[in-house]
Structures are given as structure tokens and as C-alpha cells.
Amino acid sequence: MARTDIRPIVKLRSTAGTGYTYTTRKNRRNDPDRLILRKYDPILRRHVDFREER
């Protein structure tokens, strides 16, 4: 099995609408749904939710 099959690279986009993104890997077996992480948005200078985009 290829490396990207189990842990694909996904983009996390800010829900605040600034357009800022993070890239990360996720495990499809543990997280089959869209990933939502609370991370720092440097444009707003505060922590906001970042949601996986497809």
C-alpha cells in the first residue's frame, strides 16, 4: 500500500474567511470525517477553527 493511501495530505482552511491554510496529514482509519482543528490564524492574530477542504 502506498504511503499516501493511509495518511493523505490535506489542507486545513480557516473558517474565519481569511483564506489562510495549513497542510497536515490525517489517518483515514481514525478520522474518516472532515478534520476540524483549532489553530492560530496570523491574519486575525487569534485562534480559530480550521476545517479540512476537499
Swiss-Prot record:
Question: Can you name one GO molecular function term for this protein?
Answer: structural constituent of ribosome
Q: State whether keyword Ribosomal protein applies.
A: yes
Parts forming coiled coils? none
Keywords, alphabetical: Ribonucleoprotein, Ribosomal protein
Listed under GO biological process in this entry are: translation
Tell me any Pfam family this protein matches: Ribosomal_L33
InterPro entries reported in the protein's UniProt record? Ribosomal_bL33, Ribosomal_bL33_CS, Ribosomal_bL33_sf, Ribosomal_zn-bd
Which GO CC terms are listed, alphabetically?
cytosolic large ribosomal subunit
Write out the similarity annotation: Belongs to the bacterial ribosomal protein bL33 family.
- Annotated PANTHER family: 54S RIBOSOMAL PROTEIN L39, MITOCHONDRIAL, LARGE RIBOSOMAL SUBUNIT PROTEIN BL33M
Q: What is this protein called?
A: Large ribosomal subunit protein bL33B
